[in-house]
């Protein structure tokens, strides 16, 4: 257990605990992942996404903390599935930490094998940003969720969700962004979760507006708000596998239907219908196989209801939790007849190297984030959608843990922003260094055929070289810490992905690292999509001077 049994909270201010700011940044971000304001179950080291953890167990956590505190500026700490396994002498431009989480040999890459190894204390589920120490609470996915719903509005509802009702489920660390994202797009949302504490947490952080005690009340509130054209988010305690069929029985068809339950993990992330949380915990402990079987059956029934709502006119899409795959495996042959959110709404942004870029103020002072917001508004004043996002984020988003900001910046923009931030740290305009990172859900850092790389133009959905190349090139470029994970978002066997973090500490060395890393990282996203044949990515590469040998050869041959 935690040695002093006190809540974990990252240190604030400019006094160092570690030997350098990069090590200090890793230490603070590890602790921030487990802050009670941030993590879903910090007492279990669980950050978000079912059982996505920051460290394998408490001894490993304390060993990591100790290692980061004593790590020299030319050493690298190796983390194997949440456990520190070695410190090697490297060099000052090398990452201070390299992490590999949840990786299994492909033929063994399934939940059954993972759970066996997990019970033996040999592995840990890192999700995406849980095990890579760059989770910032629900804000981390808010803009991506907003961009998804905004694009859905552009394609189907004339550019706004005003006068529409979205029904979704799952209000955990990721799904909790949905109600705020929908209301930011001027829509109405009914958000279902089996766990009242999750609903309460979203209320506390102003992501949810109200709580309905019955489905009848939720529908009445939603229809009234829709009629009046006002944005409103409604939390409803319930099981989506029961609520969606009941909506069908009542003849209630929402405008949009999706789902962000933790369906990627049938044992720990989804409650079978007919069970209370307490009953589910007992069955999970006493007969996990029976629990998994019932959970999968319930998922299939939920997907059947989603398919029927689609037939009745709702816009339905998968939000990347692999629920369609489970339903398909359970015999629902048309489970994939509604699309995933990436091919439906997000991929064009990936072609420009855009994705969920984020930064965190190690000072703990919200004023530092206010100043970085101003940088975005000044440096990118010609990008009105981006500036509009920053203005909305300032108005609506509450910080969880260390103050942070998320916004989707693309190739060229990230390096430009990083340079400016480093200058502000150097001048003292910002009171302490800034951590810059991103979600693993990014343009060139993930292979996930049921999510980020679904329906690739050239059929390369399952090609997993790209996240490996991403981790390698970011390591070579001098990222502060780099991670390679398996199974995030969609579960064991369905994804490989990489993360990176780079620290702006105001030094000339940091400036060079920032320039390299914030170029190679989004650059590979452009390359990955250009290689798959996306014209927008090819044009972006040509316009920005990214060297792609195949394109260069084509140019010479055509010239």
From Swiss-Prot:
Pfam families from the UniProt entry: Urocanase (PF01175), Urocanase_C (PF17392), Urocanase_N (PF17391)
Family note: Belongs to the urocanase family.
Any one cellular-component term (Gene Ontology): cytoplasm
Cofactor requirements of the protein: NAD(+)
Compartment list: Cytoplasm
A GO biological-process term: L-histidine catabolic process to glutamate and formamide
Record-annotated active site: 407
Free-text function comment from the UniProt entry: Catalyzes the conversion of urocanate to 4-imidazolone-5-propionate.
Keyword DNA repair appears in the UniProt entry: no
Keyword Hydrolase carried by entry: no
Catalytic activity: 4-imidazolone-5-propanoate = trans-urocanate + H2O
Lineage: Bacteria, Bacillati, Bacillota, Bacilli, Bacillales
Cofactor note: Binds 1 NAD(+) per subunit.
Pathway(s) where this gene product acts: Amino-acid degradation; L-histidine degradation into L-glutamate; N-formimidoyl-L-glutamate from L-histidine: step 2/3
GO molecular function: urocanate hydratase activity
Positions annotated to bind NAD(+): 49-50, 127, 173-175, 193, 198, 239-240, 260-264, 270-271, 319, 489
E.C. code: 4.2.1.49
Keywords: Cytoplasm, Histidine metabolism, Lyase, NAD
PROSITE patterns: UROCANASE (PS01233)
Superkingdom of origin organism: Bacteria
Name recorded for this polypeptide: Urocanate hydratase
């Amino acid at each position: 257990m935690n040695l002093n049994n006190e809540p974990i909270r990252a240190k604030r201010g400019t006094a160092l605990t570690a030997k350098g700011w990069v090590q200090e940044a890793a230490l603070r971000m590890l602790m921030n992942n487990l802050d009670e304001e941030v993590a879903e179950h910090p007492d279990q080291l669980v950050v978000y996404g079912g059982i996505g953890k920051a460290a394998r167990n408490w001894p490993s956590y304390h060993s990591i903390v100790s290692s980061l505190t004593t790590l020299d500026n030319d050493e690298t700490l190796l983390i194997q599935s949440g456990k520190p396994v070695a410190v090697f002498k490297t060099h000052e431009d090398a990452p201070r930490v390299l992490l590999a989480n949840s990786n299994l040999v492909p033929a063994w890459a399934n939940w059954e094998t993972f759970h066996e190894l997990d019970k033996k204390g040999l592995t840990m589920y890192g999700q995406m940003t849980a095990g890579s120490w760059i989770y910032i609470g629900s804000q981390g996915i808010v803009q991506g969720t907003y961009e998804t719903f905004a694009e859905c509005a552009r394609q189907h509802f004339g550019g706004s969700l005003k006068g529409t009702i979205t029904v979704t489920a799952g209000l955990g660390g990721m799904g909790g962004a949905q109600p705020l994202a929908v209301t930011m797009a001027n829509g109405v949302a009914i958000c279902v979760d089996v766990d009242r504490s999750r609903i309460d947490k979203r209320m506390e952080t102003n992501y949810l507006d109200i709580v309905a005690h019955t489905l009848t009340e939720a529908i009445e509130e939603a229809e009234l708000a829709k009629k009046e054209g006002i944005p409103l988010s409604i939390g409803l305690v319930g099981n989506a596998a029961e609520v969606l069929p009941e909506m069908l029985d009542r003849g209630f068809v929402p405008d949009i239907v999706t789902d962000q339950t933790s369906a990627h993990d049938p044992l720990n992330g989804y409650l079978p219908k007919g069970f209370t949380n307490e009953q589910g915990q007992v069955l999970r402990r006493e007969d996990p196989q029976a629990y998994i079987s019932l959970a999968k059956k319930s998922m299939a029934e939920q997907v059947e209801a989603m398919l029927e709502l689609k037939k009745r006119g709702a816009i339905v899409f998968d939000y990347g939790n692999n629920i369609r795959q489970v339903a398909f495996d359970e015999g629902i042959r048309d489970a994939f007849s509604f699309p995933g959110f990436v091919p439906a709404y997000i991929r064009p942004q990936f072609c420009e190297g855009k994705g969920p870029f984020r930064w965190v103020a190690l000072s703990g002072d919200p004023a530092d984030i206010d100043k970085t917001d101003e940088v975005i508004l000044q440096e990118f004043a010609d990008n009105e959608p981006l500036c509009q996002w920053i203005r909305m984020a300032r108005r609506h988003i509450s910080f969880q843990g260390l103050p942070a900001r998320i916004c989707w910046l693309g190739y060229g923009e990230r390096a430009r922003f990083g340079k400016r931030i480093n200058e502000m740290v150097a001048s003292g305009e910002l009171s302490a260094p800034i951590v810059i990172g991103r979600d693993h859900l990014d343009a060139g850092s993930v292979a996930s055929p049921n999510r980020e790389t679904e329906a690739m133009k050239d059929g390369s959905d399952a090609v997993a070289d790209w996240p490996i190349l991403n981790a390698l090139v970011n390591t070579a470029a001098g990222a502060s810490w780099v991670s390679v994970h398996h199974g995030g978002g969609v579960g064991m066997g369905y994804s490989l992905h990489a993360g990176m973090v780079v620290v702006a500490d105001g030094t000339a060395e940091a400036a060079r690292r920032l320039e390299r890393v914030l170029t190679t990282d989004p650059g590979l996203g452009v390359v990955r999509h250009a290689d798959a044949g996306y014209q927008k990515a090819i044009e972006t590469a040509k316009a920005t001077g990214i060297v792609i040998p195949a394109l260069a050869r084509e140019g010479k041959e055509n010239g």
